[in-house]
Design a protein with these regions (language model features):
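Feature captures C-terminal
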Residues: 396-539
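Glycine-centered hinge/linker elements that transmit conformational signals in sensory
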Residues: 170-206
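Conserved N-terminal structural module of periplasmic/extracytoplasmic solute-binding proteins
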Residues: 1-52, 65-68, 113, 360, ...
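Long, aromatic- and glycine/proline-rich binding clefts that accommodate carbohydrate-like moieties
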Residues: 297-350
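A structural signal for short loop-to-beta-strand junctions that line the ligand-binding cleft
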Residues: 31-34, 40-41, 69-104, 133-134, ...
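Extracytoplasmic/periplasmic substrate-recognition and gating elements
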Residues: 10, 109, 236-300
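Extracytoplasmic/periplasmic solute-binding protein
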Residues: 88-92, 121-177
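Hinge/lid segment of periplasmic solute-binding proteins
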Residues: 46-97, 112, 121, 147-148, ...
């Protein structure tokens, strides 16, 4: 989003944008509605399934008859089609998940790049014979378990029986649940069990994270790893070897598929339709977002594919090996509901450790799928007595100020500095569970604390407010205005969207440049180290 949002502001200067960083789950939006809050005009979510999104349906517009919906290949949009034909979610450009192969290593050992599953296994065995790990994956993560499990059996999942089961699962109601079928899913687990054996998983592999598998690959000690095309694309420049993305192989080349997932899905609140001018503006923005240029901005230079007709937004060298698969539209969109992620991790790890064979894995997966699960994070932790709005006013966001006050008190600091996007929702009166507290915080932020003199604190605030000599503007929109606790500041907007720091005060008295203060800082490395700050990181 970091390239898309300023592009939209520049493209549509007549519109006032307010970007809110939310949480990567449909439950986040459900919680907003449960508190009788209004959804933003356009909402997005990366981890998506129609199953998870169903409770939001009555609050979202049907986009099936819009011009932007007509730009999609119907085969991909059908994944988001509700039983009555409504389409409320549109998929953004696709990230490609697969196997990155060190092409130079294959050439060095005269091992052919595989074109089907048997050749894939033969390549693994050939590398193992010369002391090189054939294949490795970061099995620790839920997405790796989910993607390799589904990837190993895409032909079955894309069969008539497989797509019928998926449609039934995606359209289930809160009053009922859909278990695994007895035709497709037993084969999925049989193929996954064989896949795990063929790639030679070892005890302890279920704990492998990204860095421990990436370093041997970069050092030419591993021939293939699970990764994305975006990561594979940077390998020639960063690590000095050529890498190609390989698909999830079938028995023949014609049975091979690329596993994909949208960078996010977008929907529109049905309150937008009540205002003709706003509706026209939102549809205009959506058309821009799903244009070739918009999706390129969304991708931010990463290798992606488009689900839209006649849009080619990648020139990725890592995807050249799978050009025929892309041309054949063999792009499988992963099934990615919250429960599928969770269960795939649990069952996948137990298959890796040998606790489950294919039959036991099928039974355990099915049991978890149909058994209601108590949420351990739903316990009420405290009750909030005062509500604060997230809306930006002339004095900033009251919700963000409230959070910074709480953080300053928690960490016993004299001054705290952060950003409005630290807060993803208004703070409301009522009970808070652990999960709801996490939703208030928009993400995992870098925090630091130390002793600084007033002059250093003044320099920090100048970095975060003032436009630089090269024109870089840290306050690209008002949401990026610093939020402080224990210290007040005044700025002058000398030109629209450009600010100058005028004064800093503590309890009404000027900041003492020679005094020492305990300062707590919360932000993200992306903002702190971005070139708009002239590479001046927060102290």
């Amino acid at each position: 989003m970091k390239a898309l949002t300023p592009w939209l502001e520049e493209k549509f200067p007549e519109y006032a944008f307010n970007f809110i960083q939310g949480f990567n789950t449909m439950d986040y939006y459900r919680d907003l509605l449960n508190r009788a809050e209004q959804l933003p005009d356009i909402i997005t979510c990366r981890r998506f399934s129609l199953n998870d999104a169903a409770p939001l349906a009555e609050h979202l517009m049907d986009l099936s008859t819009t011009e932007v919906a007509g730009t999609f290949y119907s085969s991909y949009l059908n994944n988001n089609q509700e039983p009555d034909g409504a389409i409320r979610w549109l998929p953004m450009c696709a990230e490609v998940d697969g196997t990155a192969a060190n092409v130079d290593l294959f050439a060095q050992y005269n091992i052919p790049l595989p074109t089907n599953y048997a050749e894939f296994v033969a390549a693994i065995n050939a590398f193992e014979a010369v002391g090189i790990k054939g294949y490795q994956a970061d099995w620790r993560y839920d997405y790796t378990c989910l993607e390799t499990m589904q990837g190993s059996a895409i032909p079955e999942l894309m069969s008539l029986e497989g797509t019928t089961w998926r449609r039934n699962y995606e359209s289930e109601t809160e009053d009922g649940s859909t278990g695994l079928d007895d035709v497709v899913w037993p084969k999925v687990f049989e193929k996954y069990e064989q896949f795990l054996k063929d790639v030679r998983v070892q005890p302890g592999d279920d704990r492998l994270e990204l860095n421990p598998i990436a370093k041997p690959f970069y050092a030419r000690q591993t021939a293939m790893i699970r990764t994305t095309a975006g990561i594979a694309d940077v390998m020639p420049d960063q690590y000095g070897f050529n890498a190609s993305i390989l698909p999830y192989f079938g028995e023949t080349a014609n049975d091979s598929w690329l596993l994909t997932y949208p960078m996010c899905q977008a929907a529109v609140s049905n309150t937008v339709a009540q205002d003709e001018a706003k509706l026209a503006a939102v549809l205009k923005v959506l058309e821009a977002v799903y244009s070739a240029e918009g999706q390129s901005k969304m991708a931010g230079g990463a290798a992606v594919l488009s689900y839209n007709k006649e849009i080619n937004i990648t020139s990725s060298t890592s995807l050249e090996q799978v050009a025929d698969i892309i041309s054949a539209n063999h792009l499988y969109m992963r099934l990615a509901s919250t429960e599928i992620f969770r269960i795939s991790e649990d069952v996948g790890h137990k298959m890796i450790t040998g606790e489950y064979d294919a039959k036991a894995a099928y039974d355990a997966f099915n049991e978890q799928l149909v058994t209601p699960r108590a949420d351990p994070e739903a316990e009420v932790l405290f009750t909030q007595n005062t509500a604060y709005s997230i809306d930006m006013t002339d004095h900033g966001s009251a919700a963000a100020s409230s959070l910074m006050n709480a953080l300053r008190a928690t960490y016993d600091a004299s001054i705290a500095v952060g950003y409005s996007p630290l807060v993803s929702t208004s703070i409301y009166c009522g009970e808070y569970s652990k999960q709801q507290i996490l939703w208030v915080m928009a993400g995992n932020y870098a925090v630091s604390q130390g002793e600084y003199i007033g002059a250093e604190l003044r320099q920090m605030m100048e970095w975060l407010v003032n436009v630089k000599d090269n024109g870089a503007n840290p306050i690209r929109h008002r949401n990026y205005m610093p939020v402080t606790s224990g210290m007040e500041y005044k700025v002058t907007e000398y030109e629209q969207g450009k600010f100058r720091l005028e004064e800093l005060t503590i309890n009404g008295a000027p900041l003492d440049d020679t005094a020492t203060y305990t300062v707590f800082v919360a932000g993200t490395d992306v903002w702190i180290e971005n070139e708009v700050y002239c590479n001046c990181p927060m102290p």
